[in-house]
């Protein structure tokens, strides 16, 4: 597998995770982010593992991830976990802002670091390696919107 190439099983697995969440069943720390598609305008949902930094939820997107392009274009979305949903403003962080967030990602989302290792984004998965991905991976903050 080339460095940064997504595995073929990811899309089917994501569909299963979205379906499970729609039934109101939580699966570990996974949430579903739904944003309008940047071309179609139709809702697009993707599973992700948000984590807290500075008291706010954040998410990390693999290089070239469609959900990141859609989130960037929309600027707003719905973050759901089981039967609970909240509207969020989606703010992309600069590479400099992303560095300390990625260091926390290393500790908070070890499964994400393992995924980065398996796809060749990092070699050992150390905090320094993950932090060095700033500017290569997209990091977003999810600010709650009033109901």
Question: Where are the regions that the model predicts?
Answer:
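Alpha-helical membrane-targeting segments
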Residues: 1-30, 107-134
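Short low-complexity stretches enriched in small and charged residues
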Residues: 2-17, 42-47, 94-100
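Covalent nucleotidyltransferase core used to form phosphodiester bonds in nucleic acids
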Residues: 21-23, 57-69
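Short beta-strand segments
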Residues: 28-63
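Short acidic, glycine-rich loop/turn motifs
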Residues: 35-40, 81-83, 144-146
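Short strand-connecting beta-turns/loops that link adjacent beta-strands
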Residues: 53-55, 84, 147
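Short, structured beta-strand-loop surface elements
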Residues: 63-143
